């Protein structure tokens, strides 16, 4: 089994049972619906009461973020977003800006064929990887705070909008610490303060505790969200890595709780 096949297999086992774990057929009244009961996802992007772009809703990462069939189909039939599998999918192998120690660790992760993947042991996926997992997440928007609730492991993150400064040398966390600001209709989020225990993707690209993630959220229209992700980690990579993950609104579904430890049946096979 090669490294990519192993990564896809691990991902399939982790998410096959949760692929349709939403509260279905409860329509979102904040968007328009056609006479035949379908959501109008191409109408203009809504505005919040304060005039900012409204990012609220339940979103599902798209498998083909560049508009081409580049997602990888898992053994369960779920199409995995390409950046969940590989954040460097747009780069040639020789152009990945590894530092030597990072490249050595990445090769070690590849050789493990998924058994060392933190999510295979029910540890959090972390940021930005949660935005590429084929499970829904909900954005709740308020003037001074945006909360993102993820179905995967029922975790959440807070993005503070009141001008809060990111502290130096904070207590390391899986999700980091996020502060955001508006650039016209784009929400720009800076997140720092990570531990170094998560992987950036399922192939095993590592990061250090110096990771700085910059996300630019833009709602293109009612039904489509684009998140430009920049990974800036000077300890691990010689220059930033950027990709764009897209998501589609799922206006007639909601989240259900999901805990990996409650469903886990696979760790014994990695021993």
Predicted regions and their residues:
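PEST-like low-complexity, intrinsically disordered acidic/proline/serine-rich tracts
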Residues: 17-271
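N-terminal secretory signal peptides that target proteins for export/translocation
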Residues: 1-2
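Bacterial N-terminal signal peptides
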Residues: 5-16
């Amino acid at each position: 089994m090669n490294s990519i096949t192993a990564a896809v297999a691990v991902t399939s086992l982790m998410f096959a049972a949760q692929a349709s774990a939403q509260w279905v057929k409860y329509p979102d009244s904040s968007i328009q619906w056609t006479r035949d009961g379908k959501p109008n996802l191409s109408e203009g992007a809504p505005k919040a009461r304060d005039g900012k772009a409204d990012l609220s809703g339940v979103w599902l990462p798209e498998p083909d973020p560049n508009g081409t069939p580049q997602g990888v189909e898992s053994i369960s039939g779920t199409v995995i977003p390409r950046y969940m599998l590989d954040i460097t999918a747009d780069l040639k192998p020789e152009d990945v800006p590894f530092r030597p120690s990072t490249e050595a660790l990445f090769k070690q992760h590849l050789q493990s064929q998924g058994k060392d993947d933190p999510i295979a042991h029910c540890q959090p996926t972390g940021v930005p990887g949660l935005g590429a997992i084929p499970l829904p997440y909900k954005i709740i928007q308020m003037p001074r705070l945006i909360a993102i609730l993820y179905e995967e492991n029922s975790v959440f993150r807070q993005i503070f909008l009141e001008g809060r400064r990111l502290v130096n040398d904070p207590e390391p966390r899986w999700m980091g610490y996020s502060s955001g600001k508006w650039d016209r209709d784009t929400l720009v989020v800076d997140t720092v303060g990570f531990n170094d225990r998560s992987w950036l993707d399922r192939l095993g690209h590592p990061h250090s505790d110096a990771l700085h993630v910059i996300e630019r959220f833009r709602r293109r229209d009612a039904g489509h969200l684009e998140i430009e992700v920049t990974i800036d980690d000077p300890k691990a990579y010689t220059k930033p890595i950027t990709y764009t993950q897209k998501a589609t609104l799922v206006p007639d579904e909601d989240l259900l709780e999901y805990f990996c430890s409650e469903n886990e049946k696979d760790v014994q096979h990695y021993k």
